[in-house]
Amino acid sequence: MTDQSLKAAGSPQPLPGATHAVFNQTPPLEANLFTGDHALVEAVDGFGGGWAFEHLSDYGAKTGGPLMALGFDANRYTPELVTHDRYGNRIDEVRFHPSYHAIMAEGIGAGVHAFAWNERRPGAMVARSALVYLHCQAEAGTMCPLTMTFAVAPALEAEPAVARNWLPGVLSRDYDPRP
């Protein structure tokens, strides 16, 4: 293609020193994974979670953009087991890439782990399920700790003395990256 035909096609011009313009690739994924999923929107509304649309839309925009990119990095740079420190002492530490912690912070901040327990009203489980669905599209590996955190709340509530100490941390929307 000539420079004129590239302009006519609306394609970007090659950078100085580049050999050609790349125009046959899909654009970067930037989408709202909630509002763009009509079946999900209808299901959330139909099963009583319509009151959470604004929150779901906000999280859908994150999962379809910045969290998607973080998810690629979290999967590219997998956790590393460090068995010993530089002096030879056994430490058995797992080191995570910063993208993992960023995804966890966003998931916890959105309430993926505790939305239904913090919003005890009709449709809360539906809204929480939609958050899980959105989160998994960006990065599924973090769903294990988020789901285990969600699942422990009823067990803690069964023992009020234990719940007093542990439940505030479990339901918190502040991520603590410490091991």
Regions from the language model: what does each represent?
Residues 1-121:
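Extended, charge-enriched "interface" segments that sit outside catalytic cores
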Residues 96-179:
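Glycine-rich flavin
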